[in-house]
Amino acid sequence: AHFGFGMKIIFSDPYMPSDEVIKKYDATPCSSVEEVLEKADFVSIHCPGGESTYHLMNKERIGMMKKGAYLINSSRGDVIDNDALIEALKNKTIAGAGLDVFEGEPELNPGFLDCENAVLLPHLGSASIETRIAMGMRVLENMEAFYNNQEPGDRVV
């Protein structure tokens, strides 16, 4: 984000990175998650799932975000309260969300389908049925080429 988009990085982390890392990214530590939520235009969640982070982003915390802010989650689905996020998206409490993990996966809360301000992707894009079929077909093509004394398209040396 810093180098690619020129974004100013602010963060809250219980495991503070080294001064060298903070300086490298010209980052500013905040004293709490709440402080980040109040200041950030883009909030990107990076934490493990589990009891301590369950619904870390709940209705109250989502409500602390700027009206024009975007929430990004590629960590774990249960870190965000889906119902609270859907409500915030529909009410334009925040500008939008980008998600590739969802609470209750593999099921998707159908409320997300009515949110034009949400971008939804599979966490493991290569796990889609279409992609897996294409991968299998490619293996078969490589095997066929090999057994016909031809160069496989995806030769591994």
Short names for language-model regions:
Residues 1-67:
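Rossmann-like dinucleotide/phosphate-binding beta-alpha-beta segment
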